[in-house]
């Protein structure tokens, strides 16, 4: 698989993309894929051949990961890929790590059975294996911005991994209490969490600026350190998530030749992974972006105009409180010629739009790119009030507890009329409700969280190990302290 930067087409191996995280020109690395799926195509047949009967039991997730990694990380040795899969399975004791359960007309793709109760646990169990391989013995300092879930999953993934150190930057007042405790209680010497007086966009902008700063990278190198990322800007985080949607297709294969998927979206990585799965042969018909009132992504899928504006609202779905979503850049590249093999044209268009975002605060897709966007994507939004109402509705209708992010997706799906035409509608259930007790109490007026997942109940009794808080303009110094 060939990877190039979205900005200038600079080529890299998959191992290099994992090690670097961000491309030297400030762009993101993208696999050069084609829009290949159609019923009966060679790639669809290959996927069907590997899916067995669609009910893979305990091996389902592992087989889906092997399928994806053999396509997208094919130049990483098979022994390394298999070690990553084995590490993943060792950290997911459930009989079926990613089940699909039917609730109230929807197919709930449960991605929250890892240690921190969020969809990021899968990929962040595997990333350290790829990172160590790519580093080749070099020391790596992993910088990560988080709106809540990535931070704790990354800290759990890298805890105790030789040759690596990780620091996560999170909004000091913009996460749930459980999310915050999951980041501030780990005592491992190589993991660090820093609260910032700002929001996720501030943290992400600072981290990306550090990656693109030659002086900062040279300073790190003088201490024998290479900087990398555990955010979904890193292919090693993004690629394992593709398997979720390969697996969903396998599990639904006996019921339907197609499915739609609705994903609560913040930084656009999870739904981009679903798009990659479609390009690899998963029979996804429509990809639905579900936003909260910070609805930049939903508006983008409706208009082809990306306009973050100045409005930012702290909501009850904090992991989606994002205005500038990094992974959209990868989609821009694909719909601007990348899917058709016009790498130079795609890079020129992407560089133009990202430049306009920097200078003008917005950009607009070309007419052709809009056509491709609208063909595959749809979007909708839900208010905090609608989110809590949907949590109550699903609990009353199906006895099923939604976390607020999944409730946004469920609400958007219903508002848009899914399921449609007899085609199953898959909702990406991205977190357990137990991560958001304050919202659950407000939604239900009583404590409905009676059976917490392992490790959650004792969080409040653990000592706080990570106490540092800083201003946004102090993030660079916080990184330097780890050199």
Placement of each model-derived feature along the sequence:
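PLP-dependent amino-acid enzyme catalytic core
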Residues: 1-483
